[in-house]
Amino acid sequence: MMLLAIEQGNTNTMFAIHDGASWVAQWRSATESTRTADEYVVWLSQLLSMQGLGFRAIDAVIISSVVPQSIFNLRNLSRRYFNVEPLVIGENAKLGIDVRIEKPSEAGADRLVNAIGAAMVYPGPLVVIDSGTATTFDIVAADGAFEGGIIAPGINLSMQALHEAAAKLPRIAIQRPAGNRIVGTDTVSAMQSGVFWGYISLIEGLVARIKAERGEPMTVIATGGVASLFEGATDSIDHFDSDLTIRGLLEIYRRNTIAES
C-alpha cells in the first residue's frame, strides 16, 4: 500500500506519503483554491521523483479539506493521475467517531481528523489546540467522542489585521519576543509581544475555563502550523504533536479499508 494523504487548510496544503509502515515523505504548498489538477501534478511529480516514486506507486488517496472549492480539483488529481477514487472527509469517508454536538454536520473535517488522531495516542478527555488560520480548541471525551470546542482567530490573522487596519503598523514576522520580554521598547517589539503573549494568555485562559467548566483533569495537545512557536512558553500545553492530523487521516483510511473488506 502506498497512500497519499492530502490535508488542506486555509493557508497551507500538506501532501504526505505512507508506505504501509511509516511516513516516507511530507511536503507543503500554499493553499490556492483555483489550482487545477494539472498544476498540482506538475509540482507533485517533481517531489515524487526526488523520493524515487512514480505515479503508479500511489494506490490510495485520502483528502481532508476545509476549502470546498478546492475539493473538485484534488479529487480530479486522484482520479486522472493516480487512477484512484479518493476517500474524502465529509463525503464518502466513514470516520467512526461519535460527534456529540447540536449540529454534527457543522463540525469541520480538520477538527474531526485531529480528534481521531489524538484519541489514538493520548488518554482522554482531551483538549486539542490547532493553531492555523484559526485557532481551535476541541474537546475529545474519554471514549473518543468529539464534544465541541472553541474557534478563535489565528495568530497570523491577528498580526495581518493589525497591519491592514492601522496605517502606521508594519507587517512583521511573528516570533517570540527577545529575552521573553513582555513590554516592547519599539513598535515592532511591542507588536510581537502583544500578539505572542496575547496568544499565550488566550491559550492559558481558555484551557483553564474549559477544565473548570468540565470539572475534570484533561490532557492538552497542540498541533498546527505555528504551534511550535509556543513550546516552552506555557505550562498549559502537555504535548506538542505535529503529526496529529496525518495520523488521524491514516486511521480513517484504515477504518474504511477494513469496512470494505
Swiss-Prot record:
GO terms for molecular function: ATP binding; metal ion binding; pantothenate kinase activity. InterPro entries: ATPase_NBD (IPR043129), Type_III_PanK (IPR004619). It is found in: Cytoplasm. Pathway: Cofactor biosynthesis; coenzyme A biosynthesis; CoA from (R)-pantothenate: step 1/5. GO terms for cellular component: cytoplasm. ATP binds at residues 7-14, 133. Catalyzes the phosphorylation of pantothenate (Pan), the first step in CoA biosynthesis. This is Type III pantothenate kinase. The lineage of its organism: Bacteria, Pseudomonadati, Pseudomonadota, Alphaproteobacteria, Caulobacterales. The gene is coaX.
